[in-house]
Amino acid sequence: MFIDTHTHLDGEEFAADRAEVMARAREAGVGKVFLPAIDIKSTEAILDVCRQYPGYAYPMVGLHPEEVRADWREVLVQMKQYLKPENHFIAIGEVGLDYYWSREFEQEQLDAFEEQVKWSVETRLPLMIHCRKGQNEMVQLLRRYKNDLPGGVFHCFTGNEHEAEELLQFDRFVLGIGGVLTFKKSHLPEVLPAVVPLDRIVIETDSPYMAPVPMRGQRNESAYVKFVLQRLAEAYGVSDDAVAEATNAAAKRIFPLAFAE
């Protein structure tokens, strides 16, 4: 059994066959799926999916950096209203910084991220962090809260050894590793074993995006997280079971509420 710690199974891409996708995930050995939000609409959709799959699908709440606009304050006021015990959120996410396409809302992204970092400190819910082209700014911000944060995941890590070491200085955090690991030109099979202990990794799909080899180019789904697990085992020179055990333990450490029942 292993866990897909980051999957957008609430998306419209799965509207026609979500039940089959869930069944294939279980069949592949996926014991739980964790669903990050990106905005208010997706938060509603995620809660619906998680109510349909209790004990299997677990929700997060957060405003994705690419969804941050000038009205971010009003949006976060509305989103925070969802942070009630009956919604059983396991994390604040997916939140962070994304300057890949544009820095138009650079300051707004930083401010919205910091506000949601404060939610994490207040609620003791871990962070699911999305960061593209903004690691320096992210690290600078997180350092101010390092001693107060409960922990979290640096989702979709694709960086180099130096970047990995910098992130691992946040000792309650782990790296989320997905389909990029399996790509032909990926440097992760060398980078990760060099500097990242296996117990500092969780596995993810980011479905419906970033499908791993041999499914690259297709719609990604949670069942395919097994290909990430297998490639990690090859890279570290250990068994698939050893990777499952280590990444499950990391997931349990970071997301205790998903294992509370």
Can you describe what each PLM-predicted range is?
Residues 1-261:
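Mid-domain alpha/beta scaffold segments of enzyme catalytic cores
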